[in-house]
């Protein structure tokens, strides 16, 4: 029998009591660290679950930040050129945005630059765009505005004005002087004096008011047309009475034309009407 000292017996007991160590095997795994780490954390005790979970999250965040920093550092110089291009496109868009808002359909609006004078003849960008497009097809010539210039007639007429209202006399006198600057005008406010004046001097035309005291316009018209000596004299009624019955009565009394008060007629119309009346009366003789 082999004798063993106490030290050897102790070593043998310690070796036999300890579990056999598993064999060491080297396996090449394709699993990365981030997928393996959650599995390793499951082997820990239940008391340290919360601590290990928090620490693993912190490690993951830290590692993600490192990876993001590495990725940003590695791709910084690669994206530099792209960033420059993006900035160029942004600046170009900012410059072209105001012109994109200009629409041809809104042609009434005008846009002014700081150096553009505020004049009625200023051409807006819309007009320039339309003109540039239409110039290739056809050219439209805008005629200059036409101004109607009334020239006074230089005929030396002689007129008689009869009206009981002094204001109406002055208004008609001023109008006749505008139409015929060289005419001679006699104004009578008292209608009873008309017969004497007509016998004393001839007139080319007489302008009478209808509603007057003592001798009205109808009385004067009948007196004039009863005497053949005044057949070549024109007669115009200037009155507020303009109904159909009144106009028919004036025509029967020998009145050639009627101007309604107030005299809102063009100067050309009044001048041509007076000329036609006088010429027609003189041609009948």
Curated annotation (Swiss-Prot):
InterPro entries: Bact_response_regulator, CheY-like_superfamily, Sig_transdc_resp-reg_receiver. Keywords: Phosphoprotein. The keyword ATP-binding does not apply. The modification 4-aspartylphosphate is found at residue 209. One of its GO terms (biological process) is filamentous growth of a population of unicellular organisms in response to biotic stimulus. SMART domains: REC (SM00448). It comes from the Eukaryota. Residues 43-58, 128-138 have a biased composition (Low complexity). Residues 43-66, 114-142 are annotated as: Disordered. Pfam families: Response_reg. Residues 158-276 form the Response regulatory domain. Required for stress adaptation, morphogenesis and virulence. This is Stress response regulator protein 1. It comes from Candida dubliniensis (strain CD36 / ATCC MYA-646 / CBS 7987 / NCPF 3949 / NRRL Y-17841) (Yeast). The lineage of its organism: Eukaryota, Fungi, Dikarya, Ascomycota, Saccharomycotina. The gene is SRR1.
């Amino acid at each position: 029998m082999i004798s063993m000292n106490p030290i050897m017996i102790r070593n043998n007991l310690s070796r036999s009591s300890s579990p056999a160590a598993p064999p060491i095997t080297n396996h090449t795994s394709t699993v990365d660290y981030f997928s393996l780490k959650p599995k390793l954390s499951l082997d820990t005790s239940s008391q340290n679950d919360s601590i290990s979970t928090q620490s693993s999250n912190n490690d993951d965040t830290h590692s993600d930040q490192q990876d993001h920093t590495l990725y940003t550092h590695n791709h910084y110089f690669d994206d530099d050129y792209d960033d420059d291009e993006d900035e160029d496109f942004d600046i170009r868009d900012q410059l072209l945005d105001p012109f994109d808002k200009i629409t041809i359909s809104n042609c009434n609006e005008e846009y002014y630059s700081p150096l553009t004078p505020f004049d009625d003849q200023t051409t807006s960008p819309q007009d320039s765009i339309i003109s540039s497009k239409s110039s290739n097809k056809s050219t439209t010539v805008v005629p200059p505005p036409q101004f109607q210039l009334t020239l006074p007639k230089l005929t030396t007429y002689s007129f008689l004005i009869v009206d009981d209202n002094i204001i109406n006399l002055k208004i008609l006198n001023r109008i006749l002087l505008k139409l015929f600057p060289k005419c001679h005008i006699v104004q009578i406010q008292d209608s009873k004096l008309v017969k004497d004046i007509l016998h004393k001097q001839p007139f080319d035309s007489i302008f009478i008011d209808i509603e007057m005291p003592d001798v009205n316009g109808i009385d004067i018209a009948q007196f004039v047309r009863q005497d053949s000596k005044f057949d070549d004299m024109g007669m115009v009624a200037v009155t507020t009475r303009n109904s159909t019955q009144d106009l028919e009565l004036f025509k029967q009394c020998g009145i050639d034309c009627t101007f309604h008060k107030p005299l809102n007629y063009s100067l050309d119309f009044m001048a041509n009407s007076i000329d036609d009346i006088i010429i027609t009366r003189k041609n009948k003789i």
